[in-house]
Swiss-Prot record:
Gene Ontology MF: a single term: guanine phosphoribosyltransferase activity
Entry's EC annotation: 2.4.2.8
Protein name: Hypoxanthine/guanine phosphoribosyltransferase
Keyword Transferase assigned: yes
Classification lineage: Archaea, Methanobacteriati, Methanobacteriota, Methanomada group, Methanococci
Pathway this chain belongs to: Purine metabolism; IMP biosynthesis via salvage pathway; IMP from hypoxanthine: step 1/1
Lineage top rank: taxon: Archaea
Role of this protein: Catalyzes a salvage reaction resulting in the formation of IMP that is energically less costly than de novo synthesis.
Keywords of the record: Cytoplasm, Glycosyltransferase, Purine salvage, Transferase
NCBIfam families assigned to the protein according to its UniProt record, in alphabetical order: HPT_Archaea, PRK02304.1-4
Length: 196
């Protein structure tokens, strides 16, 4: 099932596109702008396919009822994964719908604070959490807290890109292990691959 999507020269497309993506500075923070994390400048199907196949290769999708992500950039990932695995997905939204059983949870990241709202999860659901980037861990902690309140069983957690200490923070605070496809940093205005 796993398809290798090489960019040429034997490198995987995700790593190649990360190394060449633009960097913008906001305050003291350097943001990398990448199709998987931002949807700009353009999301190529072969990149999305590669990322989905790599997630499927490392993930535990046996007996999973639902995939879970937070809006916005996890949406293309869970949509693609759902098409490959036939597992439905749930999106934690930034907007309240006031549906019965809706679970609000506070989210604090390096750049924003606010509420996320979980719908569509039932007690006992076996879920896999998917996200595009883990950096501070704030979004992931919010997702985990909401799923625990709903009574879901978290089978696996996979983020495409790891940056900073968020993975370690989430693992220490929640006890859940997080898998990532690539670890990066921004050094001298460029993305550096620390681990792939």
């Amino acid at each position: 099932m796993f398809i290798k999507c090489y960019s040429g020269g034997g490198r995987l497309l995700l790593e190649e596109t990360l190394k060449s993506c633009p960097i913008v500075k906001r305050g003291q923070y350097h943001y990398f702008i990448h199709p998987i994390s931002d949807g700009v400048p353009l999301v190529e199907p072969k990149l999305l396919r590669e990322v989905a196949m790599r997630i499927i290769k490392i993930g535990n999708f046996e007996d999973v009822d639902k995939l879970v992500t937070a809006e916005a950039m996890g949406i293309p990932l869970v949509t693609t994964l759902s098409l490959y695995t036939d597992i439905p997905y749930v999106i934690m939204r930034k907007r309240e719908y006031k549906l019965p059983g809706e679970i609000p949870v506070f989210q604090s990241t390096g750049y924003s604070k606010g509420q996320l709202y979980l719908n569509g999860i039932e007690k006992g659901d076996k879920v896999v959490i998917i996200d595009d980037v883990i950096s501070t861990g704030g979004t992931m902690i919010a997702i985990i807290n909401a799923l625990k309140r709903a009574g879901a069983e978290i089978k696996d957690i996979i983020c495409v890109i790891e940056r900073g200490e968020g993975k370690k923070i989430v693992e220490e605070k929640t006890g859940y292990k997080i898998k990532t496809l690539v670890k990066i940093d921004v050094v001298d205005g460029k993305v550096v691959i620390l681990r792939d």
